[in-house]
Amino acid sequence: MSKTAIIGGGSSGLAAAIFIKTNDPGAAVTIFDRMDRVGKKLLATGNGRCNLSNTAACDFGSNNGKKYAEHYHGADRSFAVNALSKFGINELRDFLLSLGIPTTFENDKLFPLSLNASTVVDVLRLKCEQLGVIFKLSQQIDIIKSSSDKFIISGEAFDNVIVATGGKSQENLGSNGSGYKMLEAFGHKCTKLYPSITQIRTETEFVRQLKGLKIDADCKLYLDNKPIAEQFGQVLFADYGLSGPPIFFISRYASVYGDRCKISLDLMPNYSMNDVFDLVKNVANNPFCDDLTLENLLTPIINKRIGQVIIKHCGYKLSAKVENITDRDIKRICSGLKAFELKVTGVNGYNIAQVTAGGIMTDKFDCNTMMSKLKPGLYAIGEVLDVDGDCGGYNLQWAFSSAFSAAKNITTGKHR
């Protein structure tokens, strides 16, 4: 009878336990977790609705004949391809349905039908209990001892160990970066780490005046004045900068490159520059504007507070008379609406970030099995590795896919 220890009771750890026990009912599986209950971080996924995957999770590109996963990042973007190919969104849906969890789509995003993360956490935990998985909770594991063919954790010997500790993000929900040191002790190396899928901090002179406002915008991130990322969606203005789904999507790059970046918001994405000019020109030429100031020039076409900030951002005084502005002034104001630029100063940190970008380098792990090339029987899955996905369900898909690969190898023993 093989014995496997799984360090970390998150989505990847719970899934790995179920895969192992389903394929080999006689196997002994123990999950160690530093929290008093498993799945705490999973409960917060997708604002508590649990965005499980995305129809684009298995979209692959090719670079010099080498396949890579388009929505995943890391030093080797090809590493995730095999796991995602073997266990993609369809396999995930089938797996969840086998546990009694039906799923549904919202646009390209996959959710449990209940739209409640607790559904997934509770069912995964209950299935583990039903299969005889042992839970050892409130246990902080810092060291994995090993002999020639065994691993020793808390005085107990195991044949295999799966490190599923996650990254550094949201320590209050369980991830504290401990997995990096465990794997480094066996000779593995860790990349530089960054908070990702988080809010972007910007110069605050103008955004503070818009605190609490939301607007659909096309968001472009520039590195040294060259565009590197773009996403459309609802942006939330905050006193520190910007939040919202499109901001989360591009935050990885802002985290890595910091104040070398600027962000540009197209606040009227459904209109061309010429269309916006015509709209503003029409307001300026309207007789009712004869006695108005620039304070209200944009009020007919966009939120009043946003309009006033754009006027000031473009260098005009709100007290200036509308009747005195020229076509050149209007073009400048329209440029502000189509490209509201803010200097990036950083991102919100690990306590808020949903994901850690970077991790244990994948070059010393087998991409088919997730097993270490340095220590047979040692596995790493999920976010602890240098694989992180875009916002939108990609990271949970990777958690399940990598768990499947590791569990399959453990139960077949082909590479042990």
Feature annotation, model-predicted:
Residues 47-105:
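Glycine-rich active-site loop/strand segments that organize a redox cofactor
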Residues 5-7, 32, 141, 156-175, ...:
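Short hydrophobic core segments
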Residues 1-12:
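Beta1/beta-strand and adjacent pyrophosphate-binding region of the FAD-binding site
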Residues 137-150:
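A conserved short coil-to-beta-strand element within the FAD-binding core of flavoproteins
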Residues 36-38, 43-44, 52, 56-59, ...:
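An anion/pyrophosphate-binding glycine-rich loop and adjacent beta-alpha core
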Residues 169-186, 387-415:
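A conserved FAD-binding loop/helix module that cradles the flavin
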Residues 5, 21-47:
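Glycine-rich FAD pyrophosphate-binding loop
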Residues 137, 308-388:
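A glycine-rich dinucleotide-binding beta-alpha-beta segment and adjacent secondary-structure elements
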